Amino acid sequence: MGKRIGLLGGTFDPVHIGHLRGALEVAESMQLDELRLVPSARPPHRDTPQVSALDRLAMVECAVAGVSPLVVDDRELKRDKPSYTIDTLEQMRAELAADDQLFLLLGWDAFCGLPTWHRWEELLQHCHILVLQRPDADSEPPDALRNLLAARSVSDPLALQGPGGHIAFVWQTPLAVSATQIRQLLASGKSVRFLVPDAVLAYIDAHGLYRAPN
């Protein structure tokens, strides 16, 4: 039986309990051997991160230290070009055994935006896609995705077979936390305790991140 590896990318600017709790729930429900959090360097579809790649990486490392099966994968930060998910999947797939399963975790909004991604039609050649369902996900997917869902979706995520090729929806506890909200609180001098892990808060405080200049 091959390994089951999950992949959750993001700017993690900063990483917060929404990312982490969702990741842990999926890792447990999907019985993953490993769930890799992959900080992105210069994501083509997102605004430029507010703090450096090294700080974002350090915060994710603080957040998952000792929390199995969550681990950090820093490969995208080592690239000197835009950070495309397809490149990461190709690289990871080449490192894994033929019977290992790779699962790409995507929030509903990111999933709906897939047709704008670089070489998006090739993603399922390398992995299964797990769409993290939220109760407020009421927007309709574009036509290209509706066709893909009709052809590739599986109702039971645990029934996904083979190294890749299918899509399933996974429930996660809704936590109305966003990195934008956390940055705004910090910039206005307010506390973000209990929105980020204590180790991340200590790092933010020690390095004066996200604070408005005096």
Curated annotation (Swiss-Prot):
- Tell me which EC number(s) this protein carries: 2.7.7.18
Specify whether Nucleus is a keyword of the entry.
no
Q: Which domain of life is it from?
A: Bacteria
**CDD domains given for it?**
NMNAT
Keywords, A to Z, come to:
ATP-binding, NAD, Nucleotide-binding, Nucleotidyltransferase, Pyridine nucleotide biosynthesis, Transferase
According to UniProt, the reaction catalysed is: nicotinate beta-D-ribonucleotide + ATP + H(+) = deamido-NAD(+) + diphosphate
Q: What does this protein do?
A: Catalyzes the reversible adenylation of nicotinate mononucleotide (NaMN) to nicotinic acid adenine dinucleotide (NaAD).
**Organism source for this protein?**
Pseudomonas fluorescens (strain ATCC BAA-477 / NRRL B-23932 / Pf-5)
Q: What is this protein called?
A: Probable nicotinate-nucleotide adenylyltransferase
Q: What class of enzyme is it?
A: transferase
Q: In which pathway does it act?
A: Cofactor biosynthesis; NAD(+) biosynthesis; deamido-NAD(+) from nicotinate D-ribonucleotide: step 1/1
